[in-house]
């Protein structure tokens, strides 16, 4: 049973790392570029009301 939970934990950590590298898995609304710099890594621009985190 411990091995099963260890595998689940590894999968969760890896999926979170992939989301961090590729950007957020969901759209983040913004009004200005400053909103995105607080919510996304790498200071992405605000396009059409959403942050370009990818």
Swiss-Prot record:
GO MF annotation terms: potassium channel regulator activity; toxin activity
S-S bonds: 30-46, 36-51, 40-53
Signal peptide: 1-23
Keyword Disulfide bond set for record: yes
Chief localization: secreted
GO CC term (a single one): extracellular region
Superkingdom of origin: Eukaryota
Tissue expr: Expressed by the venom gland.
Keywords associated with the record: Calcium-activated potassium channel impairing toxin, Disulfide bond, Ion channel impairing toxin, Neurotoxin, Potassium channel impairing toxin, Secreted, Signal, Toxin, Voltage-gated potassium channel impairing toxin
Subcellular localization, as worded in the UniProt entry: Secreted
Family statement drawn from the similarity comment of this UniProt entry: Belongs to the short scorpion toxin superfamily. Potassium channel inhibitor family. Alpha-KTx 14 subfamily.
Function: Inhibits potassium channels. May be active towards small conductance calcium-activated potassium channels (KCNN, SK), and less active towards voltage-gated potassium channels (Kv/KCN).
Description of its domains: Has the structural arrangement of an alpha-helix connected to a beta-sheet by disulfide bonds (CSalpha/beta).
Protein name, UniProt field: Potassium channel toxin alpha-KTx 14.2
């Amino acid at each position: 049973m411990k091995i099963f939970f260890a595998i689940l934990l590894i999968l969760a950590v890896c999926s979170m790392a992939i989301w961090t590298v590729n950007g957020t898995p969901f759209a983040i609304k913004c009004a200005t570029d400053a909103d995105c710099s607080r919510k996304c890594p790498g200071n992405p621009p605000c396009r059409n009301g959403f942050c370009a985190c990818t």
